[in-house]
From Swiss-Prot:
Residues 14-168 form the UBC core domain. Coiled coil: none annotated. Belongs to the ubiquitin-conjugating enzyme family. FTS subfamily. This is Protein crossbronx homolog. It comes from Anopheles gambiae (African malaria mosquito).
Amino acid sequence: MTLDANDKLLEAVLQEYKILAEYERLQSEDLGGIYVTPSYENPFLWFGVIFVRSGMYKDGVFRFTISLPNRFPNDSTVPVVAFQSDVFHPMVNPSDGVLNLSDTFPKWQSGDSHIWQMLKFVQFILQNLDDHTIPSEHVVNNEAYQLLMENRAEFLLRVEQCVEDSQRKLYDLPAQPDRFYICFDRFNPDVHGPVLQSMKEDKPTEVTTPPSSGLSWVRKGFYQPLSK
């Protein structure tokens, strides 16, 4: 293996470590109602779901993805948050679901900027829209912004529609299957009943599934980082 190849391998290993560290950090932050997991196939694509607990979008269950730049985190390019669910919001582009983050994250600063901060912002704009002043230059859904400013009743009606739509689509399967895609099943007493009962009794549940092979994106039998 040449020196150049060794350098590239080391760079890939360090990048994988940084991505895993970024994901691990989510566990220590207060992100109640937000669930995120990296794609099995692509470490630069993360799947997320937010259960909105308060505010105008309360009871909404919105799916989203986070796309990391190829050189993340050593890149000033900000990761892209795109809602897969329809979200009627002044800062969410109605054509592709991309959330405009330029107000809070004009550029990515390695060591200072973190994914958990982005998720906190997603949570904030859905639960505290009244407390967030949106600069007009950061509006990407003019209809939503105009209704919010001039016809609140109509705005709330549109929001209610997207909340109900998100609930109807909760159990939909992904267009492109991924082993780590966050899926939900309807309540099955035979399957979920014992788990629910143990939670009520505060007892640990016996795990019958095999242990995870970890979050490393190295294909079995290979030693190349990020090879999945």
